[in-house]
Amino acid sequence: TATLYPINARRWFNAEVDACWFTLTIDPALPQGNYTIDVHENLFEGAGKIARRWGVVGTTLVSDLDAYQLVRSADGPSPYTWRSGLKHDAARVFEFTSFPENLESEYIYPLLKGTDVFRGRHQHPSRWVLVPQHKFGEDTTHLQYTAPKVWRYLIGHAAALDNRKSMIYRNRPRFSVFGHGDYTFAPLKVSCSGMHKESRFQLVTQAKTPRGTRPVVLDDTCYFLPFENSTHAALVTAILRSPECQAFIQSLVFWDAKRPITKKLLSHIDLFALPCDRPTIRATAAAIAADAGVRFDANEATELF
């Protein structure tokens, strides 16, 4: 058996760290396979009260075993593939606070960061990003002919770009970015921030730019599902926002992690297996679509969910 008692490290050690008192009882007479930890509220006040139980179910680490059992039926492979946002490690080069009129617009997209998604600023992007590749690993030398202004701009910042520290840029075409593909440019995305202490899902649509309507690109602090169909996108957003889905996420997530929401966690959610009230979900989806200004087909939604 195991127990964990959180300790207020600031109070007792004047340290800005997480701390705990962890006990483990090893007894060969106890039945095997009990991989659970009783997590108490505090080492001193309320020490006798168990706040929740951590444990391993199959191969999954669960942060609240009791809550997990109520929605365990939804723990299965996601019917959709979750994607990460764009990574470039050079914000001063690739990102802009106003539309860069001096660069070819084909490579300029509205940009949302995780904080924008979390704060509900997803309908009005205020940043722009230069995406020099439309597919991962795509050659970039053609830009000197197809987008000479973009090429000259990148050459002007070559020192910063060529010296990015991450290994992912090594042995790649010059000025490469990472975490992009056809899904990056999907017209609709159901997104959330991976960095915040609450899971908030937003329906991201295309945005108007000085050069016409463009897909919105999400940065690498976000996770998202790409969609072409607005009814499907609104319905999935409604399911992810449902109390049942939020309870499932709460049962798995460890909010004190640097990135509490992960692709691995999201990929555990079998959206269509959640015990939701389906008429309520469809009504919520219709409202989400109306707020986003996109089409919603009630009959199509009923067929899907």
Residue ranges of predicted features:
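Basic, amphipathic alpha-helical recognition segments used for DNA target recognition
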Residues: 223-268
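Signature of N6-adenine DNA methyltransferases within the class I
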Residues: 1-94, 219-220
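Non-catalytic DNA-recognition/assembly elements of restriction-modification systems
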Residues: 47-58, 65, 267-305
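Residues that flank catalytic or metal-binding motifs in active/ligand-binding sites
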Residues: 17-20, 108, 126, 188, ...
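A short beta-sheet element
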Residues: 201-238
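Short, well-ordered beta-strand micro-motif
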Residues: 21-25, 113, 224-226, 270-273
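Short, solvent-exposed loop/turn elements at beta->coil junctions and helix N-caps
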Residues: 7-12, 176-180, 254-256
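Polyanion-binding catalytic cores of nucleic-acid enzymes and NTP/SAM-utilizing transferases
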Residues: 64-215
